[in-house]
């Protein structure tokens, strides 16, 4: 099961609402975000909660529940805690924060879900992926380096490539979304809440890939 969710981004007000920080923006939008208690630790900010708490929050906020309206079932062998992490090392060194949590709590790479921006997916598309390439993403590169394997979960938010093919990619990912794009993303975030909850309460997130391997959440 997934035990650590790492939201990749850059720390600082100047990076708020930028394309590279789409994962942090997603975390901020979670209906149960105000339930999380953050601590500065492991070169980042970390919050922990039990799967049972998550199931109750998802039920209370109408993200996910059983047909009778009660909280979703938690697998019998679920871990006692799930951890949310926002590395504050800047994107290129995200792995330094992730590996501290992995080592401290004795996690395995398959227990890790990294949420990040994805140039190769259009805006409005999300993708749950196991392992694979890095797509030139420095946060993923850092994570692979410290885990010594590409075999970890990824939840990718499409940001698309710049309209101007000559635009520097570093400048593009550090630029802010337009107001219209932010409105689109709020819709995307609200639909992706269900995926995140299901992935964290699932014994095997691979069962979700057929539906969420590459899902377009907005109309053209």
Positions of predicted regions on the chain:
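Nucleotide and nucleotide-moiety/phosphate-recognizing core
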Residues: 1-131, 141-155, 162-168, 175, ...
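Hydrophobic alpha-helical segments within soluble ligand-binding/sensing domains
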Residues: 136-139
């Amino acid at each position: 099961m997934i035990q650590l969710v790492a939201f990749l981004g850059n720390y600082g007000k100047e990076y708020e609402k930028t394309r590279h920080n789409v994962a942090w923006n997603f975390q901020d939008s979670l209906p149960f975000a105000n339930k999380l208690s953050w601590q500065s630790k492991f070169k980042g900010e970390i919050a922990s909660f039990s799967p049972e708490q998550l199931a109750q929050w998802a039920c209370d906020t109408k993200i996910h529940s059983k047909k009778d309206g009660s909280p979703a079932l938690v697998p019998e062998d679920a871990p006692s805690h799930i951890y949310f992490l926002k590395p504050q090392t800047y994107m290129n060194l995200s792995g330094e924060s992730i590996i501290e949590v992995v080592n401290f709590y004795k996690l395995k790479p398959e227990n890790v879900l990294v949420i990040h921006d994805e140039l190769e997916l259009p805006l409005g598309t999300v993708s749950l992926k196991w392992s694979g390439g890095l797509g030139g993403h420095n946060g993923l590169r850092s994570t692979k380096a410290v885990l010594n394997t590409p075999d970890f979960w990824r939840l990718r938010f499409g940001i698309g490539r710049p309209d101007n093919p000559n635009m520097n990619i570093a400048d593009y990912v550090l630029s802010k979304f337009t107001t219209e794009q932010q409105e689109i993303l709020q819709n995307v975030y609200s639909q992706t809440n269900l995926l995140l909850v299901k992935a964290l309460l699932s014994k095997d997130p691979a069962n979700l890939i057929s539906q969420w391997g590459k899902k377009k959440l907005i109309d053209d």
